[in-house]
């Protein structure tokens, strides 16, 4: 947004890169939605941590006799889904609540729904998917109990992530329907281009209400000295 310096991600000074986004919950998100948006943000952090734990578990799986392809895919998922999760489903949710944007709500539901399905698949743990889910962990107990115990941790975390994602989808959808959002409104935002940088709720209110104070001269006008009152 104009006039506000990007502050996310908070990069160390020695890295010659600058933050890409401006993020301030108390400044941009209405107070009644701040808790929910923060929870979505923490869910993204938890999912990133889950991918990191899954990478370690896939390494243990590989060392104990599993396929190295799972470790390679786990590394790919960590490098891919960590930034993409922030950009593709957290930022749409953030912008949707910031400016009551139906287009961003729709983007969140579509992408976050796909993320939810993928997380369920990761929790199940099909072989060759690079995810230490329940099937992979339980099936590996016959080969290595130690590695299988390590593999149970990401299975639990993937399950928790999927459960929390389901709760977030229902909560956001309930709020979205309660505010009068619709697919038609999202189409209007798309056709007008306002979805790219939707104004904040405060800016929308100011544009709607305009200047609430009438314009009066700052100094009252009196008759000249010696004049007569009408």
UniProtKB/Swiss-Prot annotation:
Q: How does it sit in the membrane?
A: Multi-pass membrane protein
Coiled-coil stretches noted in the UniProt entry, renumbered to this chain: none
Any single Gene Ontology cellular-component annotation: trans-Golgi network membrane
Protein name as annotated = Secretory carrier-associated membrane protein 4
**GO terms under biological process:** protein transport
Compartments where located = Membrane
- Topology check: give the Cytoplasmic ranges: 1-39, 170-230
Q: Which residues carry this modification: Phosphothreonine?
A: 194
Q: Which InterPro entries match?
A: SCAMP (IPR007273)
- According to the record, the segments passing through the membrane are 40-60, 61-81, 105-125, 149-169
Signal peptide residue numbers: none
Source organism: Bos taurus
Tell me the keywords, alphabetical order: Membrane, Phosphoprotein, Protein transport, Transmembrane, Transmembrane helix, Transport
The entry assigns this protein to a family as follows:
Belongs to the SCAMP family.
UniProt lineage: Eukaryota, Metazoa, Chordata, Craniata, Vertebrata
The protein's predominant localisation is membrane
Q: Where is this region: Disordered?
A: 208-230
Pfam families xref list: SCAMP (PF04144)
Q: Which domain of life is it from?
A: Eukaryota
Function of the molecule: Probably involved in membrane protein trafficking.
Q: Which PANTHER family match?
A: SECRETORY CARRIER-ASSOCIATED MEMBRANE PROTEIN 4, SECRETORY CARRIER-ASSOCIATED MEMBRANE PROTEIN SCAMP
């Amino acid at each position: 947004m104009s006039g506000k310096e990007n502050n996310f991600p908070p990069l160390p000074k020695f890295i010659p890169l600058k933050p890409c986004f401006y993020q301030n919950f108390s400044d941009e998100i209405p107070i009644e939605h701040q808790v929910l948006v923060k929870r979505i943000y923490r869910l993204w952090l938890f999912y990133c941590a889950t991918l990191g734990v899954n990478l370690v578990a896939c390494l243990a799986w590989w060392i104990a006799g599993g396929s190295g392809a799972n470790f390679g895919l786990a590394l790919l998922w960590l490098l891919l889904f960590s930034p993409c999760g922030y950009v593709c489903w957290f930022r749409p949710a953030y912008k949707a609540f910031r400016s009551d944007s139906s287009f961003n709500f729709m983007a969140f539901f579509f992408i976050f729904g796909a993320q939810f399905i993928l997380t369920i698949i990761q929790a199940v743990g099909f072989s060759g998917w690079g995810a230490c889910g329940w099937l992979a962990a339980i099936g590996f107990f016959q080969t290595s109990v130690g590695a299988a115990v390590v593999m149970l941790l990401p299975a639990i975390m993937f399950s928790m992530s999927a459960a929390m994602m389901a709760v977030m989808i229902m909560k956001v959808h309930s709020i979205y329907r309660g505010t009068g959002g619709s697919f038609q409104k999202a189409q209007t935002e798309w056709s007008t281009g306002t979805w790219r940088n939707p104004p904040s709720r405060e800016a929308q209110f100011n544009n709607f209400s305009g200047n609430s104070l009438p314009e009066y001269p700052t100094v009252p006008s009196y008759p000249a000295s010696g004049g007569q009152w009408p």
